[in-house]
Amino acid sequence: MELPQPRPFKTQGRKPTHDFLSLCSHSTVHPDPKPTPPPSSQGSHLKTHDFLQPLECVGAKEDVSRINSTTTASEKPPPPAPPPPLQHVLPGGIGTYTISPIPYFHHHHQRIPKPELSPPMMFNANERNVLDENSNSNCSSYAAASSGFTLWDESASGKKGQTRKENSVGERVNMRADVAATVGQWPVAERRSQSLTNNHMSGFSSLSSSQGSVLKSQSFMDMIRSAKGSSQEDDLDDEEDFIMKKESSSTSQSHRVDLRVKADVRGSPNDQKLNTPRSKHSATEQRRRSKINDRFQMLRQLIPNSDQKRDKASFLLEVIEYIQFLQEKADKYVTSYQGWNHEPAKLLNWQSNNNQQLVPEGVAFAPKLEEEKNNIPVSVLATAQGVVIDHPTTATTSPFPLSIQSNSFFSPVIAGNPVPQFHARVASSEAVEPSPSSRSQKEEEDEEVLEGNIRISSVYSQGLVKTLREALENSGVDLTKASISVEIELAKQSSSSSFKDHEVREPVSRTRNDNVKQTRKPKRLKTGQ
């Protein structure tokens, strides 16, 4: 049965069947630009014979046409091969390499340097099968400036399986060599010897003509170029990622080794004392504990009825309670004064002295207390505005001329403890007699405390009386027939307590300055013996 035949591209008589089959046979292999002319000896009576004829000789025609097409495609782009003994200089001027043909391949091959992938080398599956069986192609690639020159080649069809194994082995060795060249671990001579040994062992290791292998070699070239500082960036395949991960793992391992070494050096016996916590039995810790124990022992001696067997927390609580008790006891005597301040810097110690000498009465005297003002805080002076201790003049109190300045009357020797926050102090006596016993003075002090008046420090009183007696004796006054009376006012301004020469000042309560406001009713104390 004869199939309907379409018109050929060019009408050539009465042979449409032969033209149709010849076009189909050529279209399966490679589209030829020049169609094959049909034989002229075929006539209309050979239609069945023409239909079966391509089935008999299509194999030979396909082989010849495909070999011719691949040969022309491979021979068009590359330049002519250099002579065999010619030496080439490696990129960067590192060394030279020589390409020499193998004896049993010189009549088939042409060396085609292929730095980049060219479009004519892309084949489909049928063409790759034909090339694996009937042709041997050479493919060479240049590595970067630091890598050597490596050739890949395919062997004959009889050594097909062995060639692919050698190709995989050689490719792995070359990949390792390229990676090592990138890291900088192998010298150039060793890489060259490695590549030459690989070529000597496997001849020319054949590279598979599949697209994946070509892309792998191209991506390795790009990786080496990027390691050398070029700006070209291409996508890397899975095997490159694996190699880069392996390199990063080796780099991280080297960093770990460095860190371990540094940690070992840092943990040397010399610096071990600084890093480790202080030992319980060290000499420094023992000294610190002994100091703490000594100070706790001092506290236990100060606090009455303290238990030696109590722990430190309970003992500190007992100390706090005792301090609070002392503060309450101190506040009991000074709550009537507004100048009481709880700040530790302004709290002044006070120590009463029982050996107190009384000032004799008979002389009205109001000195200027400059030294006392320097020793008493301002807050204490501010609250002493209304505190006035006045002594009325008696019959024995007679004025007498004294040409003595206030500074020469007394230079109070305040030794020992400074003047505290007690605001008024008076020491008076009616006659110059030996000081009474300490028991009577203690009783008198207790009475004054109950009345709200507190005596001044005996040290200051003794200095004042001594200076006054010396001044009176120098002026010719008989102290055995005279009585001395002393008035002291503590206020902000010292002008109200200034001394007037050649006259005896009236009581301060009568001649108080108008600018000093009286905060409360003044208390007067009359003392005498």
From Swiss-Prot:
CDD domains: bHLH_AtBIM_like (cd11453). The keyword Acyltransferase does not apply. InterPro entries: bHLH_dom, BIM1/2/3, HLH_DNA-bd_sf. Its main location: nucleus. Residues 276-326 form the bHLH domain. Induction: Repressed by cold treatment. Keywords: DNA-binding, Nucleus, Transcription, Transcription regulation. GO terms for molecular function: DNA binding; DNA-binding transcription factor activity; identical protein binding; protein dimerization activity. It comes from the Eukaryota. SUPFAM superfamilies: HLH, helix-loop-helix DNA-binding domain (SSF47459). One of its GO terms (cellular component) is nucleus. It is found in: Nucleus. Residues 1-91, 245-291, 425-450, 491-529 are annotated as: Disordered. Residues 426-438 have a biased composition (Low complexity). Residues 518-529 have a biased composition (Basic residues). Residues 76-86 have a biased composition (Pro residues). Expressed constitutively in roots. One of its GO terms (biological process) is DNA-templated transcription. Residues 255-265, 282-291, 499-517 have a biased composition (Basic and acidic residues). Homodimer. Interacts with BZR2/BES1 through both C-terminal and bHLH domains. Also interacts with LHW. Positive brassinosteroid-signaling protein. Transcription factor that bind specifically to the DNA sequence 5'-CANNTG-3'(E box). Can bind individually to the promoter as a homodimer or synergistically as a heterodimer with BZR2/BES1. Does not itself activate transcription but enhances BZR2/BES1-mediated target gene activation. This is Transcription factor BIM1.
